[in-house]
UniProtKB/Swiss-Prot annotation:
Swiss-Prot/TrEMBL GO biological process terms: actin cytoskeleton organization; endoplasmic reticulum to Golgi vesicle-mediated transport; intra-Golgi vesicle-mediated transport; macroautophagy; regulation of ARF protein signal transduction; retrograde vesicle-mediated transport, Golgi to endoplasmic reticulum; secretory granule organization
Superkingdom to which the source organism belongs: Eukaryota
Biased composition regions of type Basic and acidic residues, renumbered to the chain: 1447-1459
Additional remarks: Present with 7700 molecules/cell in log phase SD medium.
Region (Disordered) location: 1412-1459
Subcellular location: Cytoplasm, Cytosol; Membrane; Golgi apparatus membrane
Phenotype caused by lack of the gene: Exacerbates the cold sensitivity of a DRS2-knockout.
UniProt organism field: Saccharomyces cerevisiae (strain ATCC 204508 / S288c) (Baker's yeast)
Domain SEC7: 570-714
GO molecular function ontology, one term from the record: guanyl-nucleotide exchange factor activity
Subunit structure: Interacts (via SEC7 domain) with DRS2 (via C-terminus); the interaction is direct. Interacts with GMH1.
Record's GO cellular component terms: cytosol; Golgi cis cisterna; Golgi membrane
Modified residues (Phosphoserine): S46, S284
Protein name listed in UniProt: ARF guanine-nucleotide exchange factor 2
Length: 1459
């Protein structure tokens, strides 16, 4: 199916109808209708004969050639005659169909109304797709149509009417160019379209509707053209491109379309099918397009035009102009040149502001479409990088027109975003100028002061527009730092940028700019902080810290300052600079080769004039030759090679100096060329290899090129050298022959079109701008490499590498950023701004900690701490503005009875509750502390601030002192006391009425107001949410020696009127905190010693209550147990406190859980290797135990300690402490004497016949005494090292309990003593040889004591029985003698008056005889045989022993239960 078949009416009919419409209109309105009626009839009615034979048709058609007929009308008639015979358009040339309409459009004598109708017809043809790909010559048709539209002419009438016609032209051009057929247009035609529409868009005399339509069309055409770059193959990447072209060939022509033409042109018509292409519109041959310029003679009247149309129609020829290639790179370059002409500084007076702005917008559109591909086409990229960018910089620096500046800045930022990596030099210079304007810094501009102190609105616009750089990419500053600041040849753009922002972000900068500038700059700083924070969120700090291999580029960055110093020295004096560069390692050695390589590769900071003077020095010939050899001139013309050469240095001024350089250059140039004599030819144009000059020829030619460059571009030269003059001067100079004509022509044109820039030629005078730009661009004249890698430098970095750059940036600007943020935070009145600032400061602290910038980290936190209003010094600090000034008020604690809550109201609480920033600071401050992971990062000042805040909150009753309840539980301590409020008030309701307030006033009541209570509540809620205790003490990284020492140092040592309210409570609070924290770092011995010393020192503070002293005792014993070998303090504790402060450490104290826990810890020290020996050998320790034992409540625990120690550790007893231990046991054994009271009572009750329901109230004491007696006896077991006096002491201790008032104890002691003497002592020993010694040393002292004499009847009998049994035991063993018996008889004789004792003596004698005779045992049985073994004794104290006690009620004796 044909493309035309989508319309209902066939295309032939549509065209015929349009012909009729045009014919009718022309007959009515054409000025040629003054002919006769018949002629008009015949002329308009020739269609009647269209179906007749050829003869008739020919006859009537010839009528149209009459000179009185309308030639335009005849064209339509002839077209109708042709179409009447056709069923479709397949066999007719498309151009033939369109020619009558195009002739109307391009003829100036036609009225605007007729032209409008022709445009409507053309619009219909293209809209309905009548001319399409299946049409014959459809390419020519489209090209002819566009050409006719761009040369549209008609008779003028009213402005609006004329513009409406042109509006149709614009729309039709847009529809064709935008359509797929637009790609078929040639370079010259597209360029005509651009010129035509752009001239309309820029003509302010046209109506606004037309101009707007033209502008939108230009944008659409721009998009269309530059989109084509995506399909055009780039140039050869290996080809060297020499920028030697002029940029000013293409200029915007006057708006001549339509009626705006000179009267003398009205009678002449341009080629209706657009065969003419003017020289000015020709595409440069350098673009690879050969244009054939066809000049047609202008017709002098309509008849001749008709002849041309008919001739062309009959021949159906293809005109050469339409055989050109489709448009591409050449017209793109021409278009950019055209746009450049609109914005170039030299044309600023030719074009209006609106035109220049529109030109900037179109360039921006082009960049937005294909900017990323421009570097693939050197000719296009050079336009952007040199003249266009130069114009941008010039406008930024000089204009005061806001709209123009805005458009320029938008284009600049687009260039930075898209081509930033390829335009570093230009961007550096531009940003430097922008910030010098913003900061009113004229040092960056050596010109006059006209550019200083720009209006505020200009500065606002500058900063608004460049803010897109960091808004679009938060990593902009990091990437800029990598590209510029880490480059030795570039300025510190990123750092200077950020430093400028820190100044401009301050509120006071609004005085020289506008109010909107500081927020915009601040956003830039915040974006940097946010970006760095995001970079490190997923990176482990330890992993980052383990990096050892620093990046080479950062090492270079660190040496940049040194490099600049060296280059400055070189620029001043090479003899001074080169040794410095060698010394610093920038130049490998002092060899000419190394020096040459350095100057070649690092010449951006070097003064090019200085380099030139150094190279041309007579003594530096070797250096010059080494330097020149570094260039590669192969395949280049001599002028191109010189251009490359002079990008590196400035040619000196003296002829001898120039000669040395040119001579070295000539030699090197010839060495680089691979000459082949067989290729030498004068006719091979464009083939440089056919021209092979020797060194002398190159020398002459080079010198001539330099002279030509000076002649053509020196404004003082009035008559410039012509090509004929130039070529004539070089006759016979090419190997004694002439240089080829074409070769010299290329050189001459190159120098004429593009000056060889000599850097620094205008330094310091009024041409500062040109000087700065020429210095910059001279090094980019030659493009030898096309960068296809468009990947951002940020994308190539690993996260760890990126952080290294962030660290380098933050090290430079971090303090400035933090200072700026704080300054803004201080004066900010908006809560949102305050929150944003403190959040950024929080991130800054994280970044500082991550990068280990300790000073900055501490500065941030100290400043935040001062802003909390909780530090005493903060009221005098600059941040005191964060809190309102509020007069002092007493600390009032209000208890609300209905809710059972307490609220402390104080000056600090109210101030804190009313300060939003204070609360904000507090929350952030402790959040930072909570996340800390570096135990060494906090400074002493910061710790002091932290402790001050904690103590302030504690003193104001806002912070609970019980931070370590586990420690209190472990030490059996009660909760810490809280400071006392100055006033306590109970309230039934939380609201207070007016009458109540007035009554309080009359009474002098200190009750706070509702507002103050509300503020205090806020304070408490904020402190609670800050979770201070967990933040500081819950993070082990925070628990350091510095914190502990700061806490102890903050303890007040003197009680006065100001601190009496909280003095002791705070002292305990600090000490308990210190000890709890020390548990986390108890391995630090010196710290433990310091704490112990400080606690002992504080415990001696005057005026401490007993409660405080007692609590400190617990702290001390814990500290001593944690520290190693602190016997000095342990001795002080026992001697100076436990023994001397009996009024404090009373029986009641040791009865408490705290006292019991203290004893346990004291006992545990005897198991410590550090204190065991000291305690066991310290008499005062045992004295203290005896003292505590006397308190009865603790006797059991002390016995348990002794029992456990003696039975599990045989080494506990020493010669030094044996008697102390024995005395302590005897003390415990004697405690059961109180059981005598129960025995007496029990006896009375039983004698009176009362039933006994209650138990023995002294049962525990009796049982403890029995256990102690048993333990005393145990001392003789497994202890063969006892001395005689120690054995006697044990026997005497047991014997002493035989006279215990409590019968149960005394009888048990008798049995134990007898068993001890019989079973646990072996005679003889080293110390004791006979039984007599045992009896005399152990038992006789008891018989002779006054206590024994008081109850002779019971005790003496018992003791004598023991003596008898012991004697008989040893008699059986054969260890007695007559002296032994005589000794015993003498003992009995003292008490023989007692009949019972006499009987015992008689029994003894009988038993002795029986043993001696070997008769076994006495018939009566000895007491020894009747006494059970002590190992079978069981102790039980249920009832007192009495002769009348029933056997069932008497206590049974068996083993003593071991604890």
């Amino acid at each position: 199916m044909s493309d035309r078949e989508f319309v209902t009416v066939d295309p032939v009919t549509i065209i015929i109808k349009e012909c009729i419409n045009l014919s009718t209109a022309m007959r009515k309105y054409s000025k040629f209708t003054s002919q006769s009626g018949v002629a008009a009839l015949l002329g308009g009615g020739s269609e009647i004969f269209s179906n007749q034979d050829d003869y008739l048709a020919h006859t009537f058609n010839n009528l149209n050639t009459n000179k009185h007929n309308d030639p335009f009308l005849s064209g339509f008639i002839q077209l109708r005659l042709m179409l009447n015979k056709l069923k479709n358009l397949d066999n007719i040339d498309s151009l033939t169909i369109l020619q009558p309409f195009l002739l109307i459009v391009s003829t100036s004598s036609i009225s605007g109304y007729i032209t409008s109708l022709a445009l409507d017809s053309l619009q219909k043809f293209f809209t309905l797709n009548i001319i399409n790909e299946s049409s014959q010559n459809y390419i020519g048709a489209h090209r002819a149509t566009v050409n006719a539209l761009t040369h549209c002419r008609f008779e003028g009438s009213q402005q609006l009417s004329d513009d409406s016609v042109l509006l149709k032209v614009v729309f039709l051009l847009r529809s064709i160019v935008d359509s797929p057929y637009g790609d078929l247009l040639s370079n010259s035609i597209i360029y005509d379209v651009l010129q035509t529409i752009l001239s309309l868009a820029c003509n302010n005399r046209r109506s606004e509707v037309l101009r707007n339509a033209a502008q939108s069309t230009m944008i659409a055409v721009t998009v269309k053209i530059f989109s084509k770059l995506k399909t055009i193959e780039p140039v050869n990447v290996n080809q060297i491109y020499i920028n030697d072209e002029s940029y000013t060939n293409d200029v915007l022509k006057a708006d001549t379309i339509g009626t705006n033409v000179e009267s003398k042109e009205e009678g002449s018509q341009e080629d209706p099918i657009g065969m003419k292409v003017n020289n000015e519109e020709a595409i440069s041959e350098d673009d690879g397009i050969e244009e054939e310029h066809i000049h047609s003679e202008k017709s002098t009247n309509g008849a001749e035009q008709l002849d041309i149309v008919q001739k062309t129609t009959r021949s159906n020829s293809r005109i050469q102009a339409y055989a050109d290639d489709n448009y591409g790179l050449p017209v793109v370059r021409q278009y950019l040149n055209l746009l450049l002409s609109l914005i170039a500084p030299e044309n600023e007076l030719k074009h209006s502001y609106s035109t220049r702005i529109f030109g900037l917008e179109l360039i921006q559109t082009a960049l937005e479409i294909s900017g990323d591909r421009l570097q693939l086409y050197p000719r296009l990229f050079t336009l952007i990088s040199d003249p266009i960018f130069k114009s941008i910089l010039f406008i930024i620096q000089n204009t005061t027109k806001l709209s123009l500046l805005q458009a320029t800045l938008q284009l600049f930022t687009t260039l930075v975003v898209i081509l930033g990596n390829n335009l570093q030099l230009q961007i550096e210079l531009t940003l430097t100028r922008i910030f010098s304007i913003l900061l009113d810094d004229g040092t960056a501009n050596n010109s006059s002061s006209e550019n200083k102190n720009k209006p505020s609105i200009i500065k606002e616009l500058l900063i608004e527009q460049i803010s897109i750089l960091w808004t679009r990419s938060p990593s902009f500053f990091t990437s800029t730092f990598i590209n510029f600041d880490c480059n030795l040849d570039r300025a510190d753009v990123s750092i200077n940028f950020l430093k400028a922002l820190t100044k401009l972000a301050l509120p006071e900068s609004a005085l020289t700019t506008t109010e909107s500038v500081p927020p915009i700059c601040l956003e830039g700083l915040v974006s940097l902080v946010d970006d760095m924070f995001d970079h490190m969120k997923d990176i482990d700090r330890e992993e980052f810290g383990r990096q050892k291999n620093e990046m080479e580029i950062l090492k270079k960055r660190d040496r940049k300052t040194e490099f600049i110093e060296c280059t400055n020295a070189f620029n001043e004096k090479p003899k001074k600079g080169i040794p410095m560069l060698i010394e610093k390692g920038f130049i490998a050695s002092d060899s000419d080769k190394d020096i040459a390589e350095f100057l070649f590769n690092n010449n951006n900071r070097m003064n090019k004039k200085t380099i030139g003077l150094l190279l041309c020095h007579p003594d530096k010939v070797s250096l010059l030759n080494e330097y020149i050899r570094l260039f590669d001139f192969s395949g280049l013309r001599v002028d191109e090679a010189i251009r490359i050469l002079l990008t590196k240095f400035r040619l000196p001024g003296e002829s001898q100096q120039i000669e040395r350089i040119i001579e070295a250059f000539s030699s090197a140039y010839c060495e680089n060329q691979d000459y082949d004599p067989s290729k030498i030819s004068d006719n091979a144009e464009d083939d440089i290899s056919t021209v092979q000059p020797d060194a002398d020829s190159v020398f002459i030619l080079s010198y001539s090129i330099i002279m030509l460059n000076t002649d053509l571009h020196n404004p003082q030269v009035k008559e410039h050298m012509s090509f004929e003059d130039y070529s004539g001067n070089l006759k016979g100079c090419c190997n004694h022959k002439d240089f080829p004509f074409w070769y010299l022509d290329r050189i001459y044109c190159s120098i004429r079109d593009k000056e060889i820039v000599m850097p620094e030629e205008h330094h310091g005078n009024e041409k500062w701008f040109e000087d700065a730009w020429n210095n910059l661009i001279s090094s980019t004249t030659v493009i030898t490499e096309i960068k296809k890698d468009t990947q951002s430098v940020m994308d190539k970095l690993t996260p760890l590498e990126l952080l290294n750059f962030d660290r380098a940036i933050f090290k430079q600007v971090g303090p400035s950023i933090v200072s700026t943020l704080f300054n803004i935070y201080v004066v900010a009145s908006d809560d949102h701004i305050s929150t944003r600032m403190i959040t950024s400061l929080d991130k800054c602290s994280y970044i500082s900690a991550f990068f280990d910038f300790k000073d900055l980290f501490n500065d941030i936190l100290n400043s935040i701490a001062k802003g909390t209003t909780l530090i005493n010094s903060s009221h005098d600090d600059e941040l005191s503005t964060l809190a309102f000034e509020y007069g002092p008020m007493p600390l009032v604690q209000i208890k609300f009875e209905d809710t059972n809550t307490e609220i402390p109201v104080s000056t600090d609480a109210v101030r804190f509750g009313r300060s939003f920033k204070g609360q904000l600071n507090t929350v952030v401050f402790f959040r930072i502390i909570r996340r800390n992971k570096d135990p060494k990062i906090f400074s002493k000042e910061l710790w002091l601030n932290i402790v001050n805040i904690i103590l302030t909150l504690y003193e104001d009753l806002i912070l609970s002192p019980d931070i370590f309840p586990d420690l209190q539980k472990r030490l059996k301590l009660s909760n810490l006391p809280k400071p006392s409020p100055e006033i306590s008030i109970n309230k039934s309701k939380e609201s207070k009425g007016l009458l109540s307030t007035f009554a309080s006033y009359l009474k002098g009541d200190e009750e706070p107001t509702e507002e103050e209570i509300k503020s205090s509540k806020k304070a408490m809620e904020c402190i609670k949410s800050s979770n201070i205790a967990a933040s500081v003490f819950g993070n082990e990284s925070n628990i350091t020696a510095d914190l502990i020492k700061t806490l102890l140092d903050s303890a007040k040592t003197e009680k006065n009127a100001d601190n009496s309210r909280y003095f002791e409570a705070e002292l305990l609070f600090i000490i308990e905190l210190t000890i709890a924290l020390f548990l986390f770092c108890k391995e630090e011995k010196e710290l433990g010693k310091f704490i112990l010393q400080k606690v002992f020192q504080l415990s001696h503070t005057k005026g401490l209550t007993k409660r405080t002293v007692r609590r400190m005792l617990t702290y001390k014993i814990l500290l001593i147990s944690l520290c190693a070998d602190q016997t000095e303090y342990l001795s002080k504790l026992i001697n100076d406190e436990l023994l001397k402060k009996g009024d404090i450490f009373t029986q009641k104290f040791f009865a408490t859980n705290q006292g019991k826990e203290f004893l346990k810890r004291l006992f545990s020290l005897t198991e410590s290797e550090f204190y065991r020996g000291f305690l066991l050998g310290n008499e005062n320790f045992w004295k203290f135990l005896r003292k505590v034992t006397a308190m009865k409540e603790q006797s059991e625990s002390i016995f348990e300690y002794l029992n456990e120690s003696i039975k599990t550790d045989s080494n506990i007893l020493t010669n030094e402490n044996f008697m102390w231990v024995l005395g302590l046991l005897d003390e415990i054994s004697s405690m059961g004497a109180v059981g005598n009271h129960w025995e007496i009572e029990y006896k009375k009750l039983t004698e009176s016949g009362h039933k006994i329901d209650k138990e023995n109230p002294y049962k525990k004491s009796i049982e403890l005494s029995l256990k102690s007696i048993q333990l005393t006896s145990h001392l003789l077991e497994d202890n063969n090292d006892l001395r005689k006096n120690e054995i006697f002491a044990i026997i005497q201790a047991l014997a002493h309990q035989c006279i215990n008032p409590c019968k149960q104890i005394s009888e048990f002691a008798v049995v134990t003593l007898e068993q001890t003497l019989i079973n646990k002592i072996e005679i003889p020993t080293n110390e004791m040889e006979s039984v007599e010694e045992l009896i005399e040393g152990g038992l006789l002292p008891l018989l002779n004591s006054s206590e024994t004499q008081e109850d002779q009847k019971i005790l003496i009998s018992s003791i004598l029985t023991i003596i008898s049994n012991v004697y008989l035991h040893y008699l059986k063993l054969g260890k007695t003698s007559n002296e032994t018996f005589l000794k015993i008889l003498s003992i009995f004789n003292k008490f023989v008056e007692d009949s019972d004792i006499e009987k015992k003596l008689q029994q003894l004698i009988l038993d002795k005889k029986s043993i001696e005779k070997g008769n076994g045992s006495s018939s009566h049985g000895s007491a020894h045989e009747q006494t059970p073994e002590s190992n079978d004794v069981e102790i039980e104290a249920t009832a007192p022993i009495d002769d009348n006690t029933d056997d069932d009620n008497k206590p049974k004796l068996s083993d003593v239960e071991k604890d």
